[in-house]
Design a protein with these regions (language model features):
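Helix-turn-helix
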Residues: 2-4, 36-74
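C-terminal peripheral helix-coil segments that are non-catalytic and often amphipathic
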Residues: 2-9, 179-252
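Inter-helical turn/loop segments and adjacent helix faces that build the functional surface
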Residues: 152-157, 176-186
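Basic, helix-initiating cap at the start of DNA-binding domains
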Residues: 2-36, 40, 48-49
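Alpha-helical DNA-contacting segments of helix-turn-helix folds
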Residues: 37, 69-79, 83, 121, ...
Length: 252
């Protein structure tokens, strides 16, 4: 029995099916590293192991990240992007302390899938000042955008201090969070509350000093700026004296 011909309209259209977004190879590599870090010592994880776990050729891995330290920097970026994807608009009218509390908790939520690996890596990092310094640069860049997303100034005279303070606050809270397995995270939130109080007191004093020394800074700028015109006036006066004894030809 002959089959009826299939109508062109009834044939499946591959283009109509929604295409899944391509996997981010950088995220694949970071997640592979964190899986390995959860079960192995940091110094036992080779680059070839990471490439195999991530399912990428070693040559591609080299193009994505030059080192394991750079992969940790990649984790900082992934977490930062996740926090920025959220919204802090509902906290816009809240005090700075509440906005910081929200940022830290959302950052910890974004770090939660990598907690097992971070727990093993953290002691190694703490023993290496150069690694701490390198990771601090990435954390500063990440927190600059975190604070900006919460409406906290980062580009004024004290902006750099606020950003670095947020990085240090996050580091101190993370020490407790890594060992806090309670669903409510009561120990973590208690530590965060204490650190926010301390940071608030420090920033209040710094802002007071900055405000009180504003007249002195203004005077110093006026003195520094005032020297240059005097030098220029003196140079012009000397030039005039020289010109009095010279016979200049008319311009051609």
């Amino acid at each position: 029995m002959a089959r009826n011909p299939v109508s062109p309209d009834s044939s499946p259209n591959p283009a109509a099916a929604p295409a899944s977004p391509p996997a981010d190879p950088r995220k694949q590599v970071v997640e592979a590293l964190m899986r390995l870090a959860a079960s192995r010592r940091w110094d036992e994880i080779e680059l070839s192991d990471i490439a195999t776990e991530a399912g990428v050729p070693l040559a591609q891995l080299r193009g994505l990240f030059p080192s394991k330290l750079a992969m940790l920097g990649g984790l900082t970026r992934i977490v930062g992007d996740a926090v920025l994807a959220g919204s802090s608009d509902d906290l816009a009218a809240e005090p700075v302390r509440e906005r910081l509390f929200d940022l830290v908790m959302r950052r910890l939520d974004a770090l939660a899938p990598y907690k097992a690996g971070l727990r093993k890596i953290a002691p190694v990092i703490r023993r290496d000042p150069l690694t701490i310094a390198a990771l601090n640069r990435g954390a500063v860049n990440s927190w600059r955008y975190m604070l900006a997303s919460a409406g906290i100034a980062t580009e004024d005279a004290l902006g750099g201090l606020r950003v670095q303070g947020a990085v240090l606050l996050m580091a101190r809270v993370s020490e407790v969070w890594l060992e806090d397995d309670e669903p409510e995270m009561s120990r973590t939130m208690a530590r965060l509350d204490r650190e926010l109080k301390t940071a608030g007191k420090i920033m209040s004093r710094v802002e007071d000093v900055h405000r009180l020394t504003a007249p002195l800074r203004g005077l110093a700028r006026a003195i520094c700026n005032g020297r240059r015109p005097q030098v220029r006036r003196r140079e012009r006066s000397d030039e005039s004296l020289r010109r009095e004894g010279e016979d200049f030809a008319p311009a051609i």
